[in-house]
C-alpha cells in the first residue's frame, strides 16, 4: 500500500475563547517521507502535499525524523491579528548555510541520511541540529517595545486551568547523538493565558541549548507580552545529573542566559 492510499485520522481541533482572544490548537499525524498526493506533485502543482511544499520552501538537505506538518497553535485577536506557531515557519529559521555545531558524529549523521532523496538534491553544510530562533509568525498585530515583563513567580501560584494543550512541531534524536525538538504549550487561567514555544537541543557530550518564546496576556487585556530568550552551556560545564539536562522543563533553569528580547503584540488600531 502506498502512502497516498493510507487513510489517516482527521486532525484534532481545539478552540477556546478568552476575552478578545481565540486560541486554536490543531494536531495531526507525522508527515511521511514520500509524496502524499494521489498523483505525484510536480513544479506545476498549485497545492502540493506537505512534503513537496516543504521541499519547495526550505533549502535544508534533510528534515527532522518527525515532522508534524499540519500541527498549529494560533492565538487570534477579535480584530483579526494573530501570532501562530507551525513547523514550516520554525524550520525556515534554521541555518541552511553552515554547520554551527561540530561534533565527532556529524559526518556519520549525514551518511545515515544518504539514502534520503531530498538530501541528494541539495548537498551542502547546514545546521543538522535544526536549531531555530523562531519567535512565532505575527500577522496583523503591531509589535512594539515593552518594559512590562511576565511575572513567572505569579504563574507558579496554583490556579484553575480552564484550557490546556501541547502541540509538537518537530523532533529528531540526531542519530542517537542527542535530541532536538520544538513544542508549544498553552494554558488558560482565570487571570490570563500563558504560552511557551520551546526549542530544546541536546548534543551528547557537547552542548545543551534552550530557546524559549513566552507569551502572556492578563485577563481583559488586548495585548500580549512576548519574551524570547536563548540559553546554552557546554555539557562539560553543567554540574547537574543527566536526568536533569535531558529534561527540557528542568534544565533551562541551569543554563546561562545568552540573549533576551521583550516586546508587546497588540492590534494595529490600538
Where are these regions (language model features)?
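Short, isolated positions in well-ordered beta-strands
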Residues: 23, 30, 83-85, 208
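Generic recognition of long tandem-repeat/solenoid scaffolds
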Residues: 75-77, 101-103, 195-197
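Short linear, low-complexity motifs centered on an aromatic residue
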Residues: 87-105
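Anionic, Ser/Thr-rich low-complexity intrinsically disordered regions
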Residues: 2-57, 61, 67, 101-130, ...
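A eukaryote-biased signal for long
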Residues: 125-270
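Amphipathic, interaction-prone secondary-structure segments
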Residues: 44-45, 49-88, 175-192
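Classical N-terminal secretory signal peptides
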Residues: 1-15, 20, 250, 257-270
